[in-house]
Amino acid sequence: MNNADLYRKSNSLQKRDALRCLEEHANKIKWKKIGDRVIDLGCADGSVTDILKVYMPKNYGRLVGCDISEEMVKYANKHHGFGRTSFRVLDIEGDLTADLKQGFDHVFSFYTLHWIRDQERAFRNIFNLLGDEGDCLLLFLGHTPIFDVYRTLSHTEKWHSWLEHVDRFISPYHDNEDPEKEVKKIMERVGFSNIEVQCKTLFYVYDDLDVLKKSVAAINPFNIPKDILEDFLEDYIDVVREMRLLDRCNNNVGESVSIKFNYKVISVYARKLCLSLM
C-alpha cells in the first residue's frame, strides 16, 4: 500500500464513497466562523483530501493530511501540499504528540479505520485530537468480499506464508452482525456524544479484470515481492471466480467481463462536547 502513483490511478471506489459520504453528512459539521483546524486521517496520496476541501469553508485555518506511509505523505505534499494544506506521517494507533492533542476542530477519515486492530485506541486518539465542541466524520469498511478472498488465499499452501497474519488486515467489523452497535459502544466508552452510526450495503462494478487487479495491488497490505505479485493477483482473480463475483455480459464487440462487489460501509458522525455542557 505504499505505491502512491498506483493508488492515485486506482482509487476510484474510495473517492466515490468519500464524495457520497460528504454529500450526505457534510451539513452536520459544526464549522466555526473563521479559522477551522481540520485533519484528514489516512490521506494516502492526498486526492481525497482535495475532495474534502470543496466542503470546507474558504476561510479555514489549516488542513493537515496524515498517513502512516512516508511515501504517501511525500507524494501528497508534492502534489497537494501548499498554502494552508500540509501532510505529515501519523500512526493513529500510536501515541499522539503534544502539538496534535486538542489541535483540531474537525477530524475526517475515509477508508482507513478498518485497517486498525485496536479500535478503541484509534477512537480515543481521534477524541484527543479534537478540541472542545469538535466533531468527526468517518467512513470505513464493514463486511466486504475482498477480506474473504484474502482468507481463502491464506489457507492455500502456495500463499499461506505470505498471508500468515491475514486477520491483521481484515476489518474488525467484517464478521460482526451488528457493527453499528459495536462502534457506538466503543465511542461512548471513549467519551463521544451525539453519536450517529450507519452501516450501508453498497456495490461497485469494476469494468474488467485488469482494473480490478490494479485496484487490489494498490491496497495490497501484504509484503509480497514484485516478482510474484502478478501470480498472486491471478490467483486472487481465480478465487473471485470461485466466489461467483464475475458478471459476464455480451455486447456487439464480444464478450466482456465485469466484476460486481457488494460490500458494507460504516459511516460515523460524533461530537466532543465541552465537559461543562455535558
Curated annotation (Swiss-Prot):
Pfam families: Methyltransf_31. Its EC number is 2.1.1.325. Specifically expressed in the corpora allata (CA). GO terms for biological process: juvenile hormone biosynthetic process; methylation. It catalyses: (2E,6E)-farnesoate + S-adenosyl-L-methionine = methyl (2E,6E)-farnesoate + S-adenosyl-L-homocysteine; juvenile hormone III carboxylate + S-adenosyl-L-methionine = juvenile hormone III + S-adenosyl-L-homocysteine. It comes from the Eukaryota. GO terms for molecular function: farnesoic acid O-methyltransferase activity. Keywords: Methyltransferase, S-adenosyl-L-methionine, Transferase. Gene3D superfamilies: Vaccinia Virus protein VP39 (3.40.50.150). Belongs to the methyltransferase superfamily. O-methyltransferase that transfers a methyl group from S-adenosyl-L-methionine (SAM) to the carboxyl group of juvenile hormone acids to produce active juvenile hormones in the corpora allata, the last step during juvenile hormone biosynthesis. Also able to methylate farnesoate to methyl farnesoate. This is Juvenile hormone acid O-methyltransferase. It comes from Bombyx mori. The gene is JHAMT.
